[in-house]
A protein has these predicted regions:
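Compositionally biased, charged N-terminal/linker segments
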Residues: 1-46
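A broad, low-specificity signal marking well-ordered, structured residues that form hydrophobic/aromatic
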Residues: 3-4, 26, 99-100, 137-140
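Aromatic- and Lys/Arg-enriched surface recognition patch
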Residues: 64-137
Length: 149
């Protein structure tokens, strides 16, 4: 099993949106960064555990846990000219973008803010992409030690 952190803006798709979905499961679509796509497509497996991170908000941080419910498959929003994440260069016969389905596990008892996480950047969270300056990936790996911290 692997561990991940996935970011979303809470006003666009927050953890409460996931809870309200049928079976508390939803496709994680719209990823348009090749490095993040490659992790989703090549490394994420059903049952992998994920930190749900709220970004671009008053207090960004980890708000809950989810898991990979379905492994990577083509992101259909890339083919739809009406979709927000449409990519005219993406072709259904040779898809460029992929998504996974995620399933809600639970809310955390409290938000673990980015500010708090950064206080451990030289210790137990050293090397965690989230606490490095300038890291803007929406999907990133988490080591077992970082997960357990």
């Amino acid at each position: 099993m692997a561990y991940w952190l996935m970011k979303s803006e809470p006003h666009v798709f927050g953890i409460d949106h996931l809870v309200a979905c049928p079976n508390q499961t939803e496709p994680w679509d719209g990823v348009r960064n090749y490095q993040a796509r490659n992790m989703m497509r090549d490394e994420m497996r059903q049952g992998d555990q994920i930190f749900f991170y709220h970004s671009n908000c008053a207090e960004p941080g980890i708000v809950g846990l989810m898991e990979v419910a379905r492994e990577a498959y083509p992101d259909h929003t890339a083919f739809d000219p009406e979709a927000k994440y449409y990519d005219p260069k993406s072709d259904p016969s040779k898809p460029r973008w992929f998504m996974v389905d995620v399933r809600y596990v639970r809310h955390l008892k409290r938000l673990i803010s980015l500010t708090e996480l950064k206080t451990h950047a030289e210790g137990p969270l050293a090397g965690m992409p989230l606490v490095r300056q300038g890291n803007r990936l929406s999907v990133m790996p988490v080591t077992p030690a970082q997960w357990d911290f």
